[in-house]
Amino acid sequence: MAERARIVIIGGGIAGVSALYHLAKMGCTDVLLLERDELSSGSTWHAAGNVPTYSGSWSIMKVQKYSAELYRELAKDKENPINYHVTGSVRLAHSNERMAEFKHVTSMARANGMEYDVLTPKELKDRYPLLETHDLVGALWDPLDGDIDPSQITAAMAAAARKLGARVRRNERVTALKQHANHEWTVTTDKAEIECEIVLNAAGYRAGEVMALIGRHLPIMTMSHQYLITEEIPELEARGEHKLPLLRDPDTSYYLRQERSAFILGPYEWQSTAMWLDGIPDQFANMLWPADIERLEKQILDAGERVPVLGDVGIAKVVNGPIPYAPDGNPYLGPERGMRNFWHCNTFSFGIAQGGGAGKAIAEWILNGRPEFDLWSIDRRRYKEYATTQYTVDKALEVYQNEYAMGFPFEERPAGRPSYMSPLYDLLKSKGAQYGARGGWERPTYYDPKGEVTDHTLSFFRKQGWRKVVAEECHAARNGVAVLDLPGFTKIKVSGPGATAYLDNLLCTKLPKVGRLSLVYALLPDGKVLSEFTVARIADDEYYLVGAASSEWHDLDVLEMALPTDGSVTLRNVTKDYGSIIVVGPKSREVLAKVTTTRSEEHTSELQSHSDLVCRLLLEKK
């Protein structure tokens, strides 16, 4: 007879154990964690253990802040000792652009209750006396940064979860997953069969293998990431217990951390390598790859100039281990698209910093229906079918190489593109369209038909080279007419005898009359916005919903999970069946009059109305 648990967690790294701990802490103790090897034996055990709160993402900053707070609290438990050092950190700025970024993130941190500060070179030297500062503009100070022993914090959370009644089984491999008509699961392992309501995939770099058990693809790849530990340095030994702050030099792409009387140097180099493209070895627990020190030469030399005591010190050890990456470097949290009771908490490139907060968030999401704060930037459903294995590898390598790069507004990185294109793509490109990507779709960001934009330098100071041509486009849209090709908007048809009642119950805004448009919202019980749609009412029981390109899978879940079971409502995803051409400006009516078989004056000029216009679109042929 099969055993039973409400929730089965697959994976015993810091993310899975944190989820176990937080589920139990919230009162759900009927949880079983299955680990194929030993706890923390995948990517967790060899992690450097840095615990930054810094992030350019509001939601990730919140996740990391909670992790730091949780670890400080757990470190007080004398039964499960944890080596946790809160040293603070300095991030170096070589330019005014970098200082502008630091000031922006400092304001975010202060809004989140953290006392970041921006330092002058002199103030920086006071905090880090071994540092060469003559060519620096300044630095950012994060007082909460530090480092922790990854295996110890994982073991401490596992022990706390067990005390609360949760279960952990090691050396037990999941071999099959089967979902039943009632949306519950049978989890088959090499030792048992377990019936459960919910499966949580927390399998780290093996999360894609778990997805294969349910016949689905996860955009994940494995990166080779290295850090080195130096031999002992007398100047550090002389400092005694006065440990230096963690140092990050983003403009040369490395971190430097005091480890007893030595340094740990962790670069994010341009020559990183995608691993295991043909599959993950069956056995790799607590294992590493051979060192590839040549890849790190530039960062080693730069660090030696920045902190001269590194000098000619020798290298005691190199750690070269596997780290999972999504195409944007962010983890996957939340439900699997179109599938009840299957959840994600995996693919952490910065698992120690994010593991504590991610465990809290996924526990809240599973038990309460939503986490405390918005997590769209790490929602599993942000990536759709276009995120193939090759796309994932290309984008992840690009992200790794730019790990410390400045996050400029309007930056468009080229790797993995194009994926989805409008039928007008080639025509508009020949007319000077410069493209960006939204939800996998190529969209023109501006036009440069005369080749006027020669300076493509990115900036925080509104000095972008495209400002002049964009201003001309805005002037045309305000005073004449502009035609925009905006493909990729999520487009869903809702029809059937129950369609009106279904949408009226799901959406907070009054539904439009036939022939009219409304901007509508699906809300959470606490009033927060879940989805936004523009809805056109085609007939009494037929509606056309338009949503954001990037949220297609999310919005489909919102609609599908609320469908009545009596078959009275039909949903049809027509996102790829129709394009989106926007005609705007005071002279837009004149343009439409030339391409429609219906006189434009027959149509109302009110904003919230629509009509089916039969148009002829003449495309130039080369």
Language-model segments: what does each one mean?
Residues 251, 260, 282, 286-420:
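C-terminal catalytic lobe of FAD-dependent flavoproteins
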Residues 373-374, 378-601, 605, 611:
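Glycine/proline-enriched, intrinsically flexible loops and inter-domain linkers
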Residues 606-622:
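Positively charged, low-complexity/disordered segments
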